[in-house]
Amino acid sequence: MPNILKRWVESDRRTLRRLSNLADKVGAYADDYAQLSDDDLKAKTPEFKQRYQDGETLDDLLPEAFAAIREGAKRVLGLYPFHVQIMGGIVLHEGNIAEMKTGEGKTLTATMPVYLNALAGKGVHVVTVNEYLSARDATEMGELYNWMGLTVGLNSAEKSPEEKREAYQADITYSTNGEIGFDYLRDNMVVYKEDMVQRPLNFAIVDEVDSILIDEARTPLIISGQSEGTSALYRRVDRFAKTLHEKDDFKIDLESKTVALTDTGIEKAEKYFNLKNLYDTDNTALTHHMDQALRANFIMLRDKDYVVQDGEVLIVDSFTGRVMDGRRYSDGLHQAIEAKEGVEIQEETKTMANITYQNLFRMYKKLSGMTGTAKTEAEEFREIYNMEVVSVPTNKPVVRVDEPDLLYPTLESKFNAVVKEIKDLHEKGQPMLIGTVAVETSEYLSQRLDEENIPHVVLNAKNHAKEADIIQNAGQRGAVTIATNMAGRGTDIKLGPGVVEIGGLAVIGTERHESRRIDNQLRGRSGRQGDPGMTQFYLSLEDDLMRRFGSDRVKSFLERMNVDGEDAVIRSRMITKQVESAQKRVEGNNYDSRKNVLQYDDVMRQQRDVMYGERNQVINQDKSLKWVLMPMIKRTVDRVVSLHTQGEQSDWDLDTLLDFGISAMVSPDKISLDDLKNKSADEIKAFFMELAEDVYAEKQKQLYDPAQMLEFEKVVLLRVVDSHWTDHIDAMDQLRQSIGLRGYGQLNPLVEYQQDGFRMFEEMISDIDYDATRLFMKSEIRQNITR
């Protein structure tokens, strides 16, 4: 182990040395560029573009381009990137992750690789976690890019397709991750090329990259249509779930957050729903609803996982503590929670297009990201995204003091200690940021502070509209801010007058999050740019994390230390280590789970690539699509004829072939049984293909304008493909829900999913061939056809 660590440290040192040397080359141009007039500096942009067109690479241009935009930033923004920021910029240009501590100027760092890569003219996307940050950065940094002669676009949800297209055509586009994903999916659902808004995905710099590529990795982006509502079934199953008792009827696995019926529970269900066998294939819809009702009633917690506002169930993001507007749990879980809470059940939806962030961002030719906390997830970034995490040194040393964790026996004794600490610090005027994991904790703490007459503001999922303003003032003397997790991320907490002298910003964590990275983010709000600061986490044996993973070992440790009583407290590095090892286990579980999602989504990705690729070929075609249609007809003819001409000729089913000819190929007067008799199977196939050629020629004659013929072909293909593809996505979703049960039969669910998914995909292709054949051959031609 020591050898491995030594190699890692050496490798990191070598990387930083190389980056520092390259940053020196950028610095070498500083004096020359400072002498240039504004016009001469601006003229560098077209000069670099021309040199790129003439064969120089972006790597060749890096030292001069970085120096030019650095000088531009000094003149336009009054900010001059430090040496370490240039190093961070190089990391981003190379398609890796720059881990830069809070307050080290990530936004300014990104200007250098953004400018350099925009010179290629293929588009650069700067991706942020919310629209507030997108708009802020597009406005502030856009001033610099515009001055240097580049165009900047801002993409947001409320923009029209025309405005979106314009934003994507710009050299640099600011957008949230969700909007890029939905635009990608919508682009692959349009029926006219002109309706597409995106260019091919070229280079993205993802701000708060850990939040987007790790915390949200499992969140699929889904475009859906209405499905048949089944609210009566949700209510009925919910009523049943509420009759069950834990241990007797069902068991909860806290680690994996799953609920399973016991034999007694299964018997109760069969009696309640009057069934012989609950797990019969005829009952899959019922068992699916039951799984969701069990999760809704016994796993999903109100005010932690979701809140109920104005008769609506709203999801709370477990990482940021924010309400996720417009998001609904899929697969009927949301409806099950609505039934549990007795609010109106909204219709279930059918998935029409979907993709995970993992697969969306892996489609970029080059991807990079920046964040204050990524090192703990370095392995995941390397394995899934092929990106290295480079910890960029701070401009000034970090002088913040991180105290060892304090551990209390109960929640009550812990919160008494937290309130006392807040009171003490408030008396000397030191500003505090108090981090909580759940909305209910922030409200409970707020109530306790009201009782003590301590003025404070609460930032949680219920009021995040003003979060940037609140967080900006959190560093003023006497400010007390309670925030769920990473509310206000991306906004700096600057210290007010006189705060440095009393110790800077104090960060108090009321619980450890299951991810070390989220704890590190909270710590990182204090001690920016060499400011003083202090962080302290308060834990209790009744905390979620301790209950799930840490408590047995810690309890025995407390017993050995003879610690008892309500007010007992332990401050020990050993406790901190225990907690971190519990967190590593959770992180390991979460990583495995994300990897698992990716393996399943990769099956869909391959299918999606095939379908979207074919679809785009059809949409972009400007001549004839005969080369697509005729092979589809041939595959259909070959399959149908082969199926009905097996064995001896006397056993062939010519009547069914005649029916096929009439229903899918031509009118009854064009074919008879005599046409099929006394022919070999190959001759029958050839006969059908002759008919197809005749019909094609006839339609061409009717539509004498080639453009109209092409439009007719596109209508046929797009209608058939889209209808079958959306059904297929939905079927794959259902397959995925049910596949886990096969794990109990000693089968590997992933392998089963891959095999069944492939078989279903092949069946869909056959169905598309058949329906396209029938629609093309049998359609009446109209002049005004629309897709």
UniProtKB/Swiss-Prot annotation:
Look up the record and report any one GO term of the cellular component aspect. Answer: plasma membrane
Q: Which reaction does it catalyse?
A: ATP + H2O + cellular proteinSide 1 = ADP + phosphate + cellular proteinSide 2
Could you list the residue ranges that cross the membrane?
A: none
List localization entries: Cell membrane; Cytoplasm
**Positions of disulphide bridges:** none
Xref: Gene3D superfamilies? Helical scaffold and wing domains of SecA (1.10.3060.10), P-loop containing nucleotide triphosphate hydrolases (3.40.50.300), SecA, preprotein cross-linking domain (3.90.1440.10)
Q: What's a Gene Ontology MF term here?
A: protein-exporting ATPase activity
Give UniProt keywords alphabetically. Answer: ATP-binding, Cell membrane, Cytoplasm, Membrane, Nucleotide-binding, Protein transport, Translocase, Translocation, Transport
Name the residues that bind ATP: Q85, G103, E104, G105, K106, T107, D492
How does it sit in the bilayer?
A: Peripheral membrane protein
> Per the UniProt entry, what are the Gene Ontology biological process annotations, in alphabetical order?
intracellular protein transmembrane transport; protein import; protein targeting; protein transport by the Sec complex
Query: What Pfam families would the database entry show?
Result: P-loop_SecA, SecA_DEAD, SecA_PP_bind, SecA_SW
Q: Which InterPro entries match?
A: Helicase_ATP-bd (IPR014001), Helicase_C-like (IPR001650), P-loop_NTPase (IPR027417), SecA (IPR000185), SecA_CS (IPR020937), SecA_DEAD (IPR011115), SecA_motor_DEAD (IPR014018), SecA_preprotein_X-link_dom (IPR011130)
Cite the EC number: 7.4.2.8
The record describes the protein's role as:
Part of the Sec protein translocase complex. Interacts with the SecYEG preprotein conducting channel. Has a central role in coupling the hydrolysis of ATP to the transfer of proteins into and across the cell membrane, serving as an ATP-driven molecular motor driving the stepwise translocation of polypeptide chains across the membrane.
Q: Subunit structure of this entry?
A: Monomer and homodimer. Part of the essential Sec protein translocation apparatus which comprises SecA, SecYEG and auxiliary proteins SecDF. Other proteins may also be involved.
Family from the record = Belongs to the SecA family.
- Put simply, this protein is called Protein translocase subunit SecA
